[in-house]
C-alpha cells in the first residue's frame, strides 16, 4: 500500500466509516518525508507529476541566510537545530525542515559588519583593527557616514560574541534541496528565546 493524500479513508464527522467506492489514484500519491539531517551535502532528484523535478535533500551543512535589518545575505554553515515549533523529536535528531530554528556560524556576517562599518562587532565605537592599517580618506568618510546605522540589538550582539546566531529556515529542504532562511531579530527573536528558555 502506498502513501496517499486522499481523505476518503477518514471517518466522517459523526464517526461513521465511509464506504470504499474507488481505489487509490496516482495523482493522490504521497512520498516518505526526507528527514534532512546536518552533514555533507547529499541531494536526490525526484521525478514528479508533469515531468517536473523535486530535489530531495537528505544531508545539508550550509545555506544562504539573510540579515533583514542590514539587507545582506551570506552563505554560512548550519551548526545545529535549536528549536522546532511542531516537534521536539526533530530537535533531538537535528532534522532540517521549514520553520526550524537553527544555529548558524556568525563569522561571515561579523566579517561583513566590520568591513562595512569599520568597527569591531560588540565594541562600542572602537576601531576595527588592533594594528591600524591606514585607510584612505574616502573609506573613512564612508565609515563615518554609516556609523549612525551601526546599532545592533543587544540579544544579537551576545550571539555574535558566542559566534552563533539563531536563524529560521524559510525554504523547504525536502522539496527544493536548499536550506535558506533569515536571522532572528527583534520581537521574533525574543519570542523564540522565551520558548527555548528552560522551564522552571
From Swiss-Prot:
<dbReference type="GO" id="GO:0003735">
    <property type="term" value="F:structural constituent of ribosome"/>
</dbReference>
<dbReference type="InterPro" id="IPR001047">
    <property type="entry name" value="Ribosomal_eS8"/>
</dbReference>
<keyword id="KW-0597">Phosphoprotein</keyword>
<feature type="region of interest" description="Disordered">
    <location>
        <begin position="124"/>
        <end position="145"/>
    </location>
</feature>
<comment type="similarity">
    <text>Belongs to the eukaryotic ribosomal protein eS8 family.</text>
</comment>
<dbReference type="GO" id="GO:0002182">
    <property type="term" value="P:cytoplasmic translational elongation"/>
</dbReference>
<feature type="modified residue" description="Phosphoserine">
    <location>
        <position position="171"/>
    </location>
</feature>
<dbReference type="GO" id="GO:0005829">
    <property type="term" value="C:cytosol"/>
</dbReference>
<protein>
    <recommendedName>
        <fullName>Small ribosomal subunit protein eS8B</fullName>
    </recommendedName>
</protein>
<dbReference type="InterPro" id="IPR022309">
    <property type="entry name" value="Ribosomal_Se8/biogenesis_NSA2"/>
</dbReference>
<feature type="modified residue" description="Phosphoserine">
    <location>
        <position position="154"/>
    </location>
</feature>
<feature type="modified residue" description="Phosphoserine">
    <location>
        <position position="62"/>
    </location>
</feature>
<keyword id="KW-0963">Cytoplasm</keyword>
<dbReference type="GO" id="GO:0000462">
    <property type="term" value="P:maturation of SSU-rRNA from tricistronic rRNA transcript (SSU-rRNA, 5.8S rRNA, LSU-rRNA)"/>
</dbReference>
<dbReference type="InterPro" id="IPR018283">
    <property type="entry name" value="Ribosomal_eS8_CS"/>
</dbReference>
<feature type="compositionally biased region" description="Basic residues">
    <location>
        <begin position="135"/>
        <end position="145"/>
    </location>
</feature>
<keyword id="KW-0687">Ribonucleoprotein</keyword>
<keyword id="KW-0689">Ribosomal protein</keyword>
<dbReference type="InterPro" id="IPR042563">
    <property type="entry name" value="Ribosomal_protein_eS8_euk"/>
</dbReference>
<feature type="modified residue" description="Phosphoserine">
    <location>
        <position position="150"/>
    </location>
</feature>
<dbReference type="Pfam" id="PF01201">
    <property type="entry name" value="Ribosomal_S8e"/>
</dbReference>
<feature type="region of interest" description="Disordered">
    <location>
        <begin position="1"/>
        <end position="41"/>
    </location>
</feature>
<comment type="function">
    <text>Component of the ribosome, a large ribonucleoprotein complex responsible for the synthesis of proteins in the cell. The small ribosomal subunit (SSU) binds messenger RNAs (mRNAs) and translates the encoded message by selecting cognate aminoacyl-transfer RNA (tRNA) molecules. The large subunit (LSU) contains the ribosomal catalytic site termed the peptidyl transferase center (PTC), which catalyzes the formation of peptide bonds, thereby polymerizing the amino acids delivered by tRNAs into a polypeptide chain.</text>
</comment>
<comment type="subunit">
    <text>Component of the small ribosomal subunit (SSU). Mature yeast ribosomes consist of a small (40S) and a large (60S) subunit. The 40S small subunit contains 1 molecule of ribosomal RNA (18S rRNA) and at least 33 different proteins. The large 60S subunit contains 3 rRNA molecules (25S, 5.8S and 5S rRNA) and at least 46 different proteins.</text>
</comment>
<dbReference type="GO" id="GO:0002181">
    <property type="term" value="P:cytoplasmic translation"/>
</dbReference>
<feature type="modified residue" description="Phosphoserine">
    <location>
        <position position="99"/>
    </location>
</feature>
<dbReference type="GO" id="GO:0022627">
    <property type="term" value="C:cytosolic small ribosomal subunit"/>
</dbReference>
Amino acid at each position: 500500500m502506498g502513501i496517499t493524500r486522499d481523505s476518503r479513508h477518514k471517518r466522517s464527522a459523526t464517526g461513521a466509516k465511509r464506504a470504499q467506492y474507488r481505489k487509490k489514484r496516482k495523482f493522490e500519491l504521497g512520498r516518505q518525508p526526507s528527514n534532512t539531517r546536518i552533514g555533507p551535502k547529499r541531494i536526490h532528484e525526484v521525478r514528479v507529476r508533469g515531468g517536473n523535478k523535486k530535489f530531495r535533500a537528505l544531508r545539508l551543512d550550509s545555506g544562504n541566510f539573510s540579515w533583514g535589518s542590514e539587507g545582506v545575505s551570506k552563505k554560512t554553515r548550519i551548526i545545529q537545530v535549536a528549536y522546532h515549533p511542531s516537534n521536539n523529536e526533530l530537535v533531538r535528531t537535528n532534522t532540517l525542515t521549514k520553520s526550524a530554528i537553527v544555529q548558524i556560524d556568525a563569522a561571515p556576517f561579523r566579517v561583513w559588519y566590520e568591513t562595512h562599518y569599520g568597527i569591531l562587532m560588540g565594541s562600542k565605537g572602537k576601531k576595527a583593527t588592533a594594528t591600524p592599517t591606514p585607510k584612505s580618506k574616502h573609506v573613512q568618510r564612508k565609515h563615518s557616514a554609516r556609523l549612525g546605522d551601526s546599532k545592533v540589538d543587544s540579544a544579537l550582539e551576545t550571539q555574535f560574541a558566542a559566534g552563533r546566531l539563531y536563524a529560521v529556515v524559510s525554504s523547504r529542504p525536502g522539496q527544493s534541496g536548499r536550506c535558506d532562511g533569515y536571522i532572528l531579530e527583534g520581537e521574533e527573536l525574543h519570542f523564540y528565546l522565551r520558548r527555548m528558555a528552560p522551564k522552571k
